[in-house]
Amino acid sequence: MDDKKFNRWFSAFILVGMSVALVLTTAIKFAGADSGKGWLLLAAFGSLMGVLATVSSANGRIITFLFGLLDVAIYGAMCLMNWRDGGSGLGNAVLHFVYFVPMQFVGFAQWRRRGSNETGQVKARRLDGRQWIWVSLAFLASTVVFYLVIARFDKSAADGFLKMAVVLDVLPLVCNIFGQALMSTAYREQWFFWIGVNIFSIWMWARALSTGGGSYSVIYIIKYSFYLINSFNGLRIWHNLSKKADACK
């Protein structure tokens, strides 16, 4: 099977699998929910937009940012609801409304400059050794700063040296920031951060579910599980795209 055919089948698997899982999970949760049915349906729709965005992103398509805009706005609202109910999510809510939403427009403009259009793929690039060092140091410093700030104000954080609710809020938050920045500027290394986002987000929503969180927690566990699978394929595709771009220099 050639690479293009594999990518088409893999994208179809992610889209169909996510859609089926969402329909079944939402139907079960909807039937058993006494309240919050509107939020449940909104979460399901946002998750579907998110999987369309991440599949498009993995394949280097600029339509990523249309689906992404709907996804991040809805997810920010869901995180805010989870935090209001006593769980984690404050940092992610702030991130999505003040950073992720406007970055969809930034990414659209940047990808157009790097050759992506309705049918073509973006010209990907890679970090060099020095850039890797700076990105790594900035990531560590940002993680510490965000932890200290959110631990100070997050009402869900219990007392103690290490507040796990805050850790699960901060790690996907910082990975999201760096992943989006590298994505908008078309760097292959974005996928290492997206893999981190997906792992930590699954952990966060699983913890919310185990402590009696919102009925939409299961939807987000499914969503980020599919995202995680897609992230590894995205890394593979973007590695090849960056090699192709280097060869054309």
Q: Predicted segment positions?
A:
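Alpha-helical transmembrane segments of multi-pass integral membrane proteins
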Residues: 95-111, 124-151, 171-175
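C-terminal transmembrane-bundle signature of multipass membrane proteins
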Residues: 179-249
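A mid-sequence, solvent-exposed acidic-amphipathic segment
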Residues: 146-189
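Alpha-helical transmembrane segments and their membrane-interface exit regions
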Residues: 47-55, 74-77, 98-110, 175-178, ...
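Hydrophobic, ordered structural segments
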Residues: 70-123
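Structural signature of hydrophobic alpha-helical transmembrane segments
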Residues: 26-46, 90-101, 159-172
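Membrane-helix interface "capping/anchor" motifs
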Residues: 53-66, 181-193
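N-terminal membrane topogenic signal
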Residues: 1-17, 129-135
